């Protein structure tokens, strides 16, 4: 397993180009299974989860290639089962189920793996597909869905806001007979992006981005070209990198309008922020950030995927900050690691109380999930001495060349291959 070796402290400064959003590219790639003609998807990040998805689509019989863009031709899909060996590394595989059953009347997906944060059952996906008329059984570790003829439109009320299940229902409903309404739908920008992609192929989806999405079923989807939205979490991570190191940054090829809650908290922490149509600049003017109070909630609230980075910000800020996690349980696994670097914090159930310290010290730490590991790498950039971050395969699942981008900002970071 690779490690990162980071030598600090560094004040990060410069420009970074933001990659496409993992959380939009994944559902869009799976939704390409619905199309009977070739699609071209631009701005897809280079990540392990993307590679796994492309491999999975290939195993289902799609032609998939990458040359700048990702090209998917699902016209000859003839296998309807997503096997355990690919699914086990990535929860997103469940997104194959809706498109398979909607277009081919059958689909099966092994129960998924992915980050070890909290309970993320597939129940809501299953509930949604059953409402659309699919018969679903769980056997031998697989979720198996079938339908006679086409799925039927339905009025579906989600009892919990779920990005994953909203994607599943919306994708499957594009080919259902009649109209589907999803109430209490997730409102994330990645949902909007997936809907825009499907509409490009001929779907009739309206209301994405609100809590009520309407899908008028169509008989088939064609081909098209689509560009994935920039990654708001990668953007936020690099903005925090500059903020905690008292530096400055310009993020290019991003979408400021997807980051309102994060930008508001960074301003509260004392950052000077300017925005343009596709760029954000942040300047700390050499000052230490001020502690902020953060409560995660579904979009447009403060994103859970930025919680670990703001934990770090509070741990090196002036004052005491409180962070409350309302989305996932067990999502403070980075905090004990940061305490080993000299941070001061107490965890009380779903809240972490952060007492800002003036400096952190390098240590050997372990990545536990995707966003937590990013915060450990940023901690290494600002800590005195050497930090070794172990198990960085988590980072490779969600950040496109993070070490290259940090190096361009002045970080002293290298990837150490296990055999060295």
Swiss-Prot record:
GO terms for cellular component: cytoplasm. UDP-N-acetyl-alpha-D-glucosamine binds at residues 91, 120-124, 160-163, 305, 327. Keywords: Cell cycle, Cell division, Cell shape, Cell wall biogenesis/degradation, Cytoplasm, Peptidoglycan synthesis, Pyruvate, Transferase. Its EC number is 2.5.1.7. GO terms for molecular function: UDP-N-acetylglucosamine 1-carboxyvinyltransferase activity. It is found in: Cytoplasm. Its main location: cytoplasm. Coiled coil: none annotated. InterPro entries: Enolpyruvate_Tfrase_dom (IPR001986), Enolpyruvate_Tfrase_sf (IPR036968), MurA_subfamily (IPR050068), RNA3'P_cycl/enolpyr_Trfase_a/b (IPR013792), UDP_GlcNAc_COvinyl_MurA (IPR005750). Pathway: Cell wall biogenesis; peptidoglycan biosynthesis. It is an enzyme of class 2 (transferase). It comes from the Bacteria. Phosphoenolpyruvate binds at residues 22-23. Pfam families: EPSP_synthase. GO terms for biological process: cell division; cell wall organization; peptidoglycan biosynthetic process; regulation of cell shape; UDP-N-acetylgalactosamine biosynthetic process. It catalyses: phosphoenolpyruvate + UDP-N-acetyl-alpha-D-glucosamine = UDP-N-acetyl-3-O-(1-carboxyvinyl)-alpha-D-glucosamine + phosphate. The modification 2-(S-cysteinyl)pyruvic acid O-phosphothioketal is found at residue 115. The active site is at 115 (proton donor). Cell wall formation. Adds enolpyruvyl to UDP-N-acetylglucosamine. PANTHER family: UDP-N-ACETYLGLUCOSAMINE 1-CARBOXYVINYLTRANSFERASE. Belongs to the EPSP synthase family. MurA subfamily. This is UDP-N-acetylglucosamine 1-carboxyvinyltransferase.
């Amino acid at each position: 397993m690779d490690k990162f070796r980071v030598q600090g402290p560094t004040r990060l400064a410069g420009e970074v180009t933001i990659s496409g959003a993992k959380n939009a590219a994944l559902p869009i790639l799976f939704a390409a299974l619905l199309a009977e003609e070739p699609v071209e998807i631009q701005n897809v990040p280079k990540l392990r989860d993307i590679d796994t998805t492309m491999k999975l689509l290939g195993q289902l019989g799609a032609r998939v290639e990458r040359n700048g863009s990702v090209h998917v031709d699902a016209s000859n899909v003839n296998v309807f089962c997503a096997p355990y060996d690919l699914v086990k590394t990535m929860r997103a595989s469940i997104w194959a189920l809706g498109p398979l059953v909607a277009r081919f009347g059958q689909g099966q997906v092994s129960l998924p793996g992915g980050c070890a944060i909290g309970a993320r059952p597939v129940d809501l996906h299953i509930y949604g597909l059953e409402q659309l008329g699919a018969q679903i059984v769980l056997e031998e570790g697989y979720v198996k869905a079938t339908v006679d003829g086409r799925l039927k439109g339905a009025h579906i009320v989600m009892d919990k806001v779920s990005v994953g299940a909203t994607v599943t229902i919306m994708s499957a409903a594009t080919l259902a007979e009649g109209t589907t309404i999803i109430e209490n739908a997730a409102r994330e920008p990645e949902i909007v992006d997936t809907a825009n992609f499907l509409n490009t192929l001929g779907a009739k989806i309206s209301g994405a981005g609100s809590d009520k999405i309407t899908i008028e079923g169509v008989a088939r989807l064609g081909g098209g070209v689509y560009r994935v939205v920039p990654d708001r979490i990668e953007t936020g991570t690099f903005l925090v990198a500059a903020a905690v190191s008292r530096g400055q940054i310009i993020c290019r090829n991003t979408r400021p309008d997807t980051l309102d809650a994060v930008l508001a908290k960074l301003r509260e922490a004392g950052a000077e922020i300017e925005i343009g149509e596709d760029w954000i600049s942040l300047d700390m003017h050499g000052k230490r950030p001020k502690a902020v109070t953060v409560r995660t909630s579904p979009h447009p609230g403060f994103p859970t995927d930025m919680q670990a980075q703001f934990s770090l910000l509070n741990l090196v800020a002036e004052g005491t900050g409180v962070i409350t996690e309302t989305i996932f349980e067990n999502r403070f696994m980075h905090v004990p690691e940061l305490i080993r670097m000299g941070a001061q914090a107490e965890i009380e159930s779903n809240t972490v109380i952060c007492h800002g310290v003036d400096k952190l010290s390098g240590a050997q730490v372990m990545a536990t999930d995707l966003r937590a590991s990013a915060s450990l790498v940023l901690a290494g950039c600002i800590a005195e001495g050497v930090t070794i971050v172990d198990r960085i395969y988590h980072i490779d699942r969600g950040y496109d060349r993070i070490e290259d981008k940090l190096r361009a900002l002045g970080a002293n970071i290298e990837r150490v291959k296990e055999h060295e």
